[in-house]
Amino acid sequence: MTRPVFRHDRPGTSASAWTTVLAAHAMVPLQLPSVAGRLVVVGAHPDDETLGAGGLIRVAAIAGWQVEVVSATAGEGSHPRSPTHSRELLAQVRRHELDQAIARLAPGAAVTCLGLPDGAVADHLAELVAHLVAMIGIDGEDVLLLAPWRRDGHPDHEAAGLAAAIAAARTDARLVEYPVWLWHWGDEQGVPWAQVRELPLDDEVRAAKMSATAAHASQVEPLSPAPGDEVLLDAPLRAHFRRDLELFFEDDEPVRDDALDLVHRERSDPWQVESDYERHKRAVTLASLPRQRYEHGLEVGCSIGALAVDLAQRCGRLLAVDASETAVTAARERTAGLDQVEVRRAAVPAQWPSGRFDLVSISEVGYFLSPRQLAGVVERSLAALTEDGHLLLCHWRHQPVGWPLAGPAVHEAFLASGAPVLVEHQDPDFVLHVLGRPA
């Protein structure tokens, strides 16, 4: 378990000191859509969501938003030396408190506790990302995702924030982060003021937040008079969350999602390219090409270069690209003897290569894009085709864990462009299309 950078039982920055600091800064209001959507709230532990964003949860509920709350852990590690409460009992108590708190902020909201180990959320990052992606789904642009600040000073908070940032990048959800422990350990110099967003809280919203905070009794009151059962959030700490406003951070910089690069670093052949399934799929892919020879091909998402080797036999020139530097290195090694092949690192659609191609191959990569990114790839790939060019699509038809799109949805996005379908192949495990350039 990674230790926090602070001690909750040591003196910290006072609420009055922060009041002075905040008064000296003109802060940008938090802009909420005029039409109610979905609010997905992530906490590392029960009470994070109430302390950091209880006011916003209440505001959204009043406005008719669909509110969903997920706590990564049950917070069973809050009192490690308690003589009266085991970790199992604390988990049970805190789950119940979470339900009660959210009922006071957003009656009817869905509440989920994943039960990841308290203090070790970072060790379960992929699991948390996958859960959030599944919650958000394919309509991420309608979702406001709230999560702990990635620089909050507590490892569980920072891991939960990172998981939410990755999930937002994969789904196109809007990410807004809330600080909790910053108010205890931080100071004016530690705040990225350009990212700060302010939400004023009226009396009714503040009262609901205070009531929800009180519902987390195991944290705001002693468990018992015995040593080890002391109050976790004492009055000076709670004072930070009694303000008539809440502050959030909104960072426009995209998070680095290196999951696919990690897959390639951990395994030299992550997709088992010599398996019977992969060999069969490549054979069908090559047999589906309407022409024997192409002048200039582009393969998007080449991975370690297995398909690139085969496509090179059909292309005078082939440019193969992948977002993973590790994959690019492996693909260059695999195609080293093929002078007509160039392998380049590029993340599409942002780094789409220039030029026109009479063959564009997009195979087993579309579902690793967010819906917005996929729309960009559809546009760029069709625009890059020569008049007689072909767009080859081939994707596993099942749902990949941790991403919102499956193969059939990827193909539907391309088919919706109106591009003529020249070849269609439906396999139990994959779907293949060859499209022409739209008229």
Give the label of every model feature segment:
Residues 353-360:
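A short acidic, Gly/Pro-enriched loop at the edge of an enzyme's catalytic core
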Residues 2-37, 111, 235, 240-292, ...:
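Conserved N-terminal segment of class I S-adenosyl-L-methionine
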Residues 148, 363-366:
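Residues lining the SAM
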Residues 188, 193-219:
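A conserved mid-domain beta-alpha-beta active-site/ligand-binding segment of alpha/beta enzyme cores
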Residues 253-292, 296-353, 369-383, 390-439:
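Class I (Rossmann-like) S-adenosyl-L-methionine-dependent methyltransferase catalytic domain
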Residues 73-76, 181-182, 396-400:
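Short "lid" loop at the C-terminus of a central beta-strand within the Rossmann-like core
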Residues 2-177, 211, 227, 236, ...:
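Active-site beta-strand->loop->alpha-helix modules in alpha/beta enzyme cores, enriched
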Residues 172-189:
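Short, flexible loop segments at boundaries between secondary-structure elements
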